[in-house]
Amino acid sequence: TVLGLVAGGTGNDAAEALGLRVGSLEDRVDRALADPVPVDLIWTGERHAVTSCVAGFPAAVNVRAEAMRFPRGPSRYTLATLAELPGMRPGRYRLTLDGEVVELTAAVVVVANTAFFGGGMRICPDADPTDGLLDVCVVGEVGRLSLLRSFAKVRTGAHLDHPDVSMFRAAAVGIVALDARPGLRADGEPFGSLPCDLVASPGAIQVAGALTAPPGRA
């Protein structure tokens, strides 16, 4: 089965990451009828995700954004971020990365198959959806103002220069919330709760006309 994707949603992060958001509507339809390209997915043992799974502050932002009726488009996530910021508190997590255990305090944990989340933000700009690996972005024990400044840089990927941002890469990622919010979101939708085990599923889906090279920083 081949997936033909024509961007038309609020965030369009999957389409953006796979090069399917460029051009006119006619161009996008033509791309959705092009030759298939194998693309990795994230697998939990029960469900698949395409772009990323998020815990912590961005999960709360996503819930807020989905409840909003105005505005449409990526600016909804910006307003949701500002609304959730006063209640932001980093939490403790245990991550297992290909068997290696790391305990840390974090405001943000993102496990990504592709580069974009939150309506075009380059949270993991080097994520490659064909390498059989997941990119993990952790924003550590930061204050509200520092987090806001970091999020302002996510559009370009410049947040990776922040000293409290850490990047990991693994084929299998386990997440346990020690004293953090347990909610988990994936592809902008509810995705259960922590703990969870996420595994890269190589070539799990065929996407028509996909361009899979990581975008890198803007």
Predicted features, each with a name:
Residues 1-107:
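Catalytic core of DAGKc-family lipid kinases
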Residues 44, 64, 111, 139-140, ...:
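Short beta-strand-to-turn element immediately C-terminal to the catalytic PLP-Schiff-base lysine
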Residues 54, 58, 110-125, 190:
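Glycine-rich phosphate/pyrophosphate-binding beta-alpha loops
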Residues 58-61, 103-105, 117-120, 144-148:
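Short acidic/glycine-rich loop or secondary-structure boundary segments that cap or lie
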Residues 69-76, 125-146:
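Gly/Ser/Thr-rich active-site loops/lids in small-molecule metabolic enzymes
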Residues 89-91, 105-107, 130-135, 169-171:
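A generic structural signal for short beta-strands and their flanking turns/coil linkers
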Residues 97-103, 128, 138-218:
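ATP/nucleoside-binding phosphotransfer catalytic cores, i.e., glycine-rich phosphate-binding loops
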